[in-house]
């Protein structure tokens, strides 16, 4: 997998809900910045083909994970996740055929889960595969939209969702495996026509569906793996889960 796969990690966000002057991805879990855990997993599946998109406190982020064998891309304006990935596209290795996109605030994600996503994507020969999980309480997450044939036709962010769409329990984890070609074709067609006025990466799923591309869903991730850290309370919860995981392993 390492010869053809690259990973893009989104780590440029402001993290306002952390209520802290420190960049969100620099908050520590077990003495390490949460971003370091995501980088570890990315390197395991892609070797040196890992790109970290930085923005807020970019230099501090680079210093905090300075030992990592990754390259950095600077997102000068916070225009959304789609724009962040667009900034990273020119830095992809020439031999890269598949791209995995991760968020820098999911420190519990494991390499086996990512490898399973990639294998599912490659085996099916899809243009894009998103990792999805069904939750009892999906509040706060984007919802995965399915058509009458149970095919993925889009993702709707909660802020833009109707009451009916908010009842959907299948959520987007923000983790994708896509072909480089599809990513290059779809991203220029993303527009900021949403409640936040941002370029959402999630829109590539709708764009792919509408243009007849092969879009699919991969299941199987443990719930705790996809937990994002957005608040101090989330940070405490994730740290407790990581301590519990370490205790089981030992």
What are these regions (language model features)?
Residues 7-9, 51-52, 100-101, 128-131, ...:
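Structural beta-sheet core signal
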Residues 17, 107-108:
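A short, conserved beta-strand element in the Rossmann-like catalytic core
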């Amino acid at each position: 997998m390492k010869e053809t796969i690259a990973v893009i990690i989104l780590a440029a966000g402001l993290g306002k809900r952390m209520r802290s002057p420190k960049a969100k991805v620099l908050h520590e879990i077990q003495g390490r910045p949460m971003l370091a855990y995501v980088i570890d997993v990315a390197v395991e599946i892609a070797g040196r083909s890992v790109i970290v998109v930085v923005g807020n406190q970019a230099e501090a982020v680079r210093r905090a994970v300075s030992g990592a064998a990754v390259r950095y891309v600077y997102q000068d304006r916070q225009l959304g996740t789609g724009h962040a990935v667009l900034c990273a596209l020119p830095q992809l290795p020439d031999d890269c055929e598949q791209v995995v996109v991760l968020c820098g605030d999911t420190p519990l994600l494991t390499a086996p889960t990512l490898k399973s996503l990639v294998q599912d994507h490659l085996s099916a020969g899809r243009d894009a595969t998103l990792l999805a999980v069904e939750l009892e309480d999906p509040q706060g997450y984007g919802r995965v939209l399915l058509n009458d044939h149970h095919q993925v036709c889009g993702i709707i962010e909660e802020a833009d969702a109707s009451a009916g769409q908010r009842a959907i329990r299948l959520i987007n984890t923000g983790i994708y495996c896509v072909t480089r070609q599809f990513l290059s074709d779809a991203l220029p067609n993303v527009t900021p026509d949403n409640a936040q006025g941002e370029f959402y990466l999630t829109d590539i799923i709708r764009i792919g569906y509408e243009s007849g591309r092969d879009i699919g869903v991969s299941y199987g991730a443990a719930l705790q793996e996809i937990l994002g850290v957005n608040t101090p309370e989330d940070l405490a919860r994730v740290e407790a889960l990581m301590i519990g995981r370490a205790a089981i392993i030992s």
